[in-house]
């Protein structure tokens, strides 16, 4: 099912950017793309994946995995925080990798087209 998405991305509590995009929700999997990245969110298993030309970042409840495509190299990155919430038509994902100074939070509001 196609969805209209409003996506707010925060670092700590500071809004970095806001996007209005189209996405697809099927079998509890939300997919969408912006100009540089594609995203897959498994709502049931609380998995967030972000992919671009250079890398794939996959965040699970217990760990984060970074794949460097050009080098065909996988790195497991310690995860200091992962919070995944779904309320009605809103998904909130917050994570802090050990290599980050500040946590990132992504709020996605979905509505039918």
Explain the meaning of each model-derived region.
Residues 53-54, 58, 64-85, 102:
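Terminal, non-globular segments
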Residues 6-9, 30-34, 48-50, 93-98:
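Short beta-strand segments that buttress and anchor functional surface loops
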Residues 85, 90, 96-113:
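Mixed-charge, glycine-accented linear interaction segment located at domain edges/termini
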Residues 1-13:
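Tryptophan-anchored aromatic micro-motifs
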Residues 19-58:
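Short, well-structured hydrophobic secondary-structure segments
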């Amino acid at each position: 099912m196609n969805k209209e998405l409003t996506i707010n991305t925060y670092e700590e509590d500071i809004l970095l950017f806001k996007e209005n995009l189209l996405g697809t929700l099927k079998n509890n999997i939300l997919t969408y793309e912006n100009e540089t990245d594609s995203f897959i969110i498994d709502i049931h298993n609380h998995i967030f994946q972000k992919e671009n030309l250079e890398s794939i970042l996959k965040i699970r409840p217990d760990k984060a995995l970074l794949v460097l495509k050009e080098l065909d190299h996988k790195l497991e990155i310690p995860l200091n925080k992962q919070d995944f919430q779904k309320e009605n038509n809103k998904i909130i994902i917050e994570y802090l990798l050990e290599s980050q100074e500040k946590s990132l939070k992504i709020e996605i509001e979905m509505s039918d087209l």
